[in-house]
Amino acid sequence: MCVRRELANAIRMLSIDAVQNAKSGHPGMPMGMADIAEVLWRKFFKHSPTNPNWNNRDRFILSNGHGSMLLYSLLHLTGYDLSIDELKKFRQLHSKTPGHPETGETPGVETTTGPLGQGLANAVGMAIAERTLSAYFNRPDYDIVDHYTWVFVGDGCLMEGISHEVCSLAGTLKLGKLIVFYDKNGISIDGKISNWFTDDTVMRFKSYNWHVVDKVDGHDANSIKNSIEEAKSVKDQPSIIICNTIIGFGSPNKSGTADSHGAPLGEEEIFLTRKNLNWKYSPFEIPNKIYDKWNFVKQGLKLEENWNKQFHLYKSEYPALAEEYSRRIKKKLPTQWYKKTKDYIFNLQKNPQNIATRKASQNAIEEFAALLPELIGGSADLSPSNLTMWSKSSSITENLCGNYIHYGVREFGMTAIANGISHHGGFIPYTSTFLMFVEYARNAVRMAALMNTKHIFVYTHDSIGLGEDGPTHQPIEQLANLRMTPNIDVWRPSDQVETAVAWKYAIEEKNGPTALILSRQNLFQFSRNNEQIKNISYGAYILYDSKKPIDIIFISTGSELQITLTSAKKIAALGYSVRVVSMPSNNVFDRQNIDYKESILPSYITKRIVIEASIKDFWYKYAGSEGLIIGMETFGESASEEVLFKKFGFTVENIVNKSKILLKH
C-alpha cells in the first residue's frame, strides 16, 4: 500500500536521479516541494494529461524554474507524453526536458521560466485572462471559463523586484483564483538568506491585499490540504500559502544547506538518501503501484468530457457567444478582418494627415480593436502619452470584462504579465511605454521573443525628436537592441499608412512579438501607389526612384524619412540617379526572398547612405563598407527637436554634403 510520503518520494528520487545523470541541475527544490506538489496535483489540480491544451484546465506555473525536475516528474507520473527516457535525457540537446521549463518543448509546460519572478508575473497575467474571459463568456449555469492559476515560488522570486510590481497589481485587481505557494526554505545559492532577506512576508502581502496562509508545514499533507482549501474559499483576494520547507528534504548530509541547491548530490549521498527515505528501487525505477496512484489520465478525460457536454449545451443556448469563444481560443481572425483592414489602409493613403505615428497608432487601434474584442491593451502609466486608449477602452478595474489594463509604473511587470495573458489564450495583448523605458522591461521582452509570444509592444517617443526631456528619456541604443533580438519583428513607421500596415502585420503574425516604434512629433505623409502600399508589408520598399542606372541609394526609417527624401531629390537635381528606400522593418525585409531583396537593394550599388536617429553601428550590414551612416554616436541632450536634429546632423544640408562626398569617391 502506498502512503503519501512514498508518492512524494517518487518526485524526489526522479529529480535526484535525473540531476545526477545529467551531471548538473537543482535537486534541492524538487526534494523540498515534493509533498506540496503531491497534494496539489493529486487532490486539487484540474487538468487532462492526454490534452495538455484543454481550454479549461488549471494553469500550473513553476516560477522557480531551476527546480524543473519537479515539474517533469509530475508530468511523467500523471500521464503526459513525457517518457522515463526523456527524464533520463534531462538537460540534453533536443530532449523534452531542458534545464529550465520551456513552453512548446514539453507538453504541460505553460510558460518558460528560469529568470526568477517572471513565472509569477506570467501567472498574474493568466489569472487576469481567466477572470476577464469568464466575465465575458460565462452565463448562469454555464461556467465555460472557470479555472485556477497555481504558482510555485521560492525566496529568489520574492527577492526580485518584479514580484513587488505584479503582486501589488494582483492584490489591487482582487484576483481570487490566483494561489501562490511560497517555498520558504531559508536557503539560496549563497547560503542562509537571513543575512540578506529579512522581509516580513506576511505583512508585505497583506499590504498588497492578499490573503495570507502562514506557517504551513510544507511536509505535512493535512497542513497543505487545509491551506489550499482555505485559499480556495477566499474569492476576492489572491492567496499566498507560506510553506516552511527543508531544501533537499531526505538527504542526510545536504538537506537544509546550499549544497543541495544547484548541484548533483553525488553517488554516496544519493545512496544515503535512498536509505533514509526507504526507497528500495533502482535509479529511474518507479513501481506500478506508485504509477497507478499518480496516473490522472482517466480523471482528466472525465473532467474534459464534462466540460465538453456543458459547452455543447452552452452552444445551443448561446450560439453567437460559443462561436466567438471558439474563434478566439483557436486564434482565428474574424472573416471581415482582411477586407476591412485593407480598405482602411488604402483610405489612409487617399486622405493624408501629417500626424505623429503614435497618433496614427491610436487611430489604427480605434479601427482594428472594433473588429477584435480579444485585443487587450495597457500602458505603464503613460496612456495619454502613448495614445493607447481608444473610444471603447474599458478598464478591467472598473469592468470585469474590460479591454484595458492600467499597469501603473511597472514596465517589467506589465510586460511579463501580458506575456502570461497571451499564453493563457483568448487575447492579443499590447503594452506600451516610452522606448527608453524598454530598459526596465528588457528581460520580459526577451522572454516574449524566446517563447514566440504573440505580444505587441507599443514604444513611443522614439528618438532625440522627443526634445527637451533630454538624454534620460531619449533612446539611442534601444532600437538596435530590439532589432538584434531573435524572433522580434521591429517596425519604425514613417507615417500613418506605414503605421497601419505595421499594426495589421503585428496582429496577423502567428508567432512571436512585434515592437512598434513610434514618434512623439508630427510626421509628413508620403505619396504612394498601390504597389508601394503592398510592398510596405515586406519590410522595405522603394519610395522614390529618379532614373536608372542608380548612382546612390538612401535608406531611412521613421521621422528621418522626410529629410532623406528631400535630400535625395536635391542630389537628383544635380544630375545623379537616386533611390530612396523606406525600411520600416529590417527584420521582415531580411526574411524576403533573394530576388525581392536584390530588387530593393541591388548588391552592385555600393554607394549607400543610411539616415536614422539611433545608434549607427546596427546599420553597417545595409550600408556596406563603401556606404555612410548618419546616426547617433553619443547620448542626446536637452533641447528642442529642431535644435537637436541640427546638432546631430539630421538636416538636409548635412545629408546632401555627405552624399556629394560619397559620390565623388
Curated annotation (Swiss-Prot):
Active-site residues annotated for this sequence: 411 (proton donor)
One Pfam assignment: Transketolase_C_1
EC numbers on record: 2.2.1.1
Cofactor needs: Mg(2+); Ca(2+); Mn(2+); Co(2+)
Site (Important for catalytic activity): 26, 261
GO annotation terms (biological process): pentose-phosphate shunt
Keyword tags: Calcium, Magnesium, Metal-binding, Thiamine pyrophosphate, Transferase
UniProt xrefs under SUPFAM superfamilies: Thiamin diphosphate-binding fold (THDP-binding), TK C-terminal domain-like
Signal peptide segment: none
CDD domains, alphabetized: TPP_PYR_DXS_TK_like (cd07033), TPP_TK (cd02012)
GO cellular component: cytosol
UniProt: substrate binding residues: 26, 261, 358, 385, 461, 469, 520
Residues annotated as binding thiamine diphosphate: 66, 114-116, 156, 185, 261, 437
Described function: Catalyzes the transfer of a two-carbon ketol group from a ketose donor to an aldose acceptor, via a covalent intermediate with the cofactor thiamine pyrophosphate.
Protein name: Transketolase
Native source species: Buchnera aphidicola subsp. Schizaphis graminum (strain Sg)
